[in-house]
Amino acid sequence: MKRIAYIIPGYGESHLRQRGYNKVAKFFEERGIEPIHVEIDWEKRNPKKFSDYVAQFLKVYKKPRGAEVYILGFSYGATTAFLSVTKAKPTALILCSLSPYFEEDFSGLKPTWIKWFKKNFTKSDYSFDRLAAKIKTPTYLIVGDKEPDACLLRVKDAKKKLRDSYLSIAKGAEHKIGQKAYLETVRKVISKL
């Protein structure tokens, strides 16, 4: 059976610039899963829309008949993966440091950040609760214990609201997929697939 994993980087990142994504790809290869790096043009337009990032991902996404397909996203890439899951219908989803920019998160963010986000990301007010209710895909959540509180709260809330979800906390890790502690947690999650 063919096994494929799509890897969506964080905002402004790429496997060409951040080596952590290539290490993640190797973890998939060790499990007999073919990694596919997804390049997102984060600066394609201004103001930005998450729906544009989802469309870019779905343009390269393929699910061969009978194949197991996994989607791993980091930060904004995790949000892109989450927003695309009902259309992509993967075998499992791995959300690394899911961004806390859903409607339910705004009350815990600084007003200046919310103002910037709403100015630069139009039509990107998504309700996590409404989307989570539609998701039946097994979801692995990863977050570093040294990440900002908003990220930790978003991921812990996701664990409660997603039916078939598993939470792994990377001890000593910040919001950096290339950090050794973060990568070790990603490796452990991938080893379960």
Q: Model-flagged regions — what are they?
A:
Residues 20, 45-64:
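Alpha/beta-hydrolase active-site loop
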Residues 134-136, 141-143:
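Short beta-strand/loop motif that positions the catalytic acidic residue
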Residues 94-104:
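Active-site nucleophile loop of the alpha/beta-hydrolase fold
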Residues 36, 160-176:
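Catalytic histidine neighborhood in serine/cysteine hydrolases
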